[in-house]
Amino acid sequence: MAKIVDIKGREVLDSRGNPTVEADVVLDNGIVGSACAPSGASTGSREALELRDGDKSRYMGKGVLKAVANINGPIRDLLLGKDPVDQKALDHAMIKLDGTENKASLGANAILAVSLAAAKAAAQDQDLPLYAHIANLNGTPGVYSMPVPMMNIINGGEHADNNIDIQEFMIQPVGAKTFAEGLRWGTEIFHHLKAVLKARGLNTAVGDEGGFAPNLASNKEALDAIAEAVANAGYTLGTDVTLALDCAASEFYKNGKYKLSEEGEYSSAEFAEYLAELTRKHPIISIEDGLDESDWDGWKVLTDKIGEKVQLVGDDLFVTNTKILKEGIDKKIANSILIKFNQIGSLTETLEAIQMAKAAGYTAIISHRSGETEDSTIADLAVGTSAGQIKTGSLCRSDRVSKYNQLLRIEEQLGSKAAYRGRAEFRG
């Protein structure tokens, strides 16, 4: 049995130029596992705490030296001599040491970086690909699938400096036969969309997640531009390719109303109907955070209205937290959960959220954050848990493409052992 002989933390930069935490877990046989914690822009109020320094003289207060010190001090002392393969024991030990509900003492970014680095070291120690080790931890050894990518090709909201309210307009290549084919389709549509926007005299600069970030007259104009790009690329909208939205509605929910910059102001019931109408007019098969995280009555209205046919994803709503997810399941709120490592702060708790969702008939979508690094762990998580769907941004920026490239490698390794199920991964 290999043992942990050293743990090192350091401050590195994410894709937005903000500091984040990287950790190395070193084993007695010389193996080193390294991992970085991501960071979000639009965040749920109940996410685990990302520990920042608050020292305005460094990185405008966003430094993470406190989290790094926690890795190099108490976390290192706690885990020296431990078995890296026993992920649950490592994570539970760190959670216990932290002693808070939201990991405010050590920092979720510190705990997560070590948690993922340990998993990578353990995979290497067993001579396993990371996705295979994750499948073992998930209790599903040897069971894999390739995820359908939800490609964010127009960015708005908190992810872009433009006037679009809805945060993400996504495409899914549901008619493709393999992940590689789906990735090619999405890439071709992305390039055709650039041409469509240019022809309309619109900006083709990209947002945090690599999607285009033009100023548009309405959310409808974004959907129309995507439809034109899909057709120009030679694909059929609704069969080859479908649409998805991330409203991030908490960002424009003010005083009990949903306030869109161009379309006006809506009550919860009215906004639920606004979204339902969009699904009737466009092949939108997934809507994330369609209502505010605190508007559970509105969520119930939306779920009852279109939940049988449309995937309704809780991100800010559930924050990868099993306690909150269980409440949602019991109340029949939404039908899907977005899975983000750093919302909960450990690999073990992430796997528990995926397992709970699947047991209740909810889908689970593995997701990046807007502040990413070259770390591609979420690709292995998607395959190793057979999640079926992944959100990792657009078809540019190496912080996004690194995940797609890892999925290409995995599909090449697994071949027919990992099916790409396309439309079957979604409701309706």
From Swiss-Prot:
Pfam families: Enolase_C, Enolase_N. Its cofactor is Mg(2+). The active site is at E209, K340. Binds a second Mg(2+) ion via substrate during catalysis. Catalyzes the reversible conversion of 2-phosphoglycerate (2-PG) into phosphoenolpyruvate (PEP). It is essential for the degradation of carbohydrates via glycolysis. Component of the RNA degradosome, a multiprotein complex involved in RNA processing and mRNA degradation. This is Enolase. The lineage of its organism: Bacteria, Pseudomonadati, Pseudomonadota, Gammaproteobacteria, Pseudomonadales.
